[in-house]
Regions:
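Binuclear metal-dependent hydrolase catalytic cores
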Residues: 1-69, 74-81, 147-171
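Cap/insert and terminal regions of metallo-dependent hydrolase folds
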Residues: 76-167
Length: 171
């Protein structure tokens, strides 16, 4: 997406563009992608998550399997038939529960609810698109939950996992 590439190309040091430097050393090759790219036999489709085209959801497809990666800032979740029947949705920027750190209770009218998905909203996305499994990532310690708290929640829900460093997913 052009806006995303412009933002990435703007990354620089006092010496200039970081990516220009890496490309001059033949370490990288930039290739603008507007809708999709195929690498070997993996098709990667880019779905804009906002009108400005600055936030992207990535849909990976290979051998009849499908994984959606929706990292950050994807609320509201865009409508796309491409999401139907995915094997996995990996999603970030969520709030799990209303009882947060230091006895803070997140009310329905809190502005965070406009930016971040609740656990229940993610389950609604899962149901709407018939997604088989969900992995929550970018878990925030600020919410006051330990990883054990997330593991206990996993036991209560079918096909829901919470990411951890080094996690791998087999499709």
């Amino acid at each position: 997406l052009p806006n995303v590439l412009n933002d990435v190309n703007a990354l620089s040091t006092k010496y200039g563009s970081i990516l220009d430097y890496y490309e001059s050393l033949n370490l990288i090759k930039r290739k603008p992608v507007s809708k999709r790219i195929v690498i070997n036999d993996i098709k990667i489709t880019l779905v804009p998550a906002n009108e400005e085209g600055t936030v992207t959801i990535f849909v990976f497809e290979q051998n009849g399997k499908k994984l959606i990666y929706a990292p950050c800032d994807v609320k509201p979740f865009p409508n796309s038939r491409l999401f139907n029947d995915a094997d996995y949705l990996i999603i970030g920027n969520t709030i799990i529960g209303n009882n947060l750190k230091n006895n803070f209770y997140l009310t329905k009218n809190n502005p965070l609810n406009l930016e971040l998905f609740s656990f229940e909203e993610v389950l609604e996305i899962k149901a709407k698109y018939n997604i088989q499994n969900v992995v929550f990532t970018h878990l925030e310690e600020d919410w006051g939950k330990s990883y054990d708290d997330y593991l206990n929640l996993e036991k209560e829900c079918i096909a829901v996992k919470f990411a951890y460093d080094g996690m791998t997913i087999e499709l």
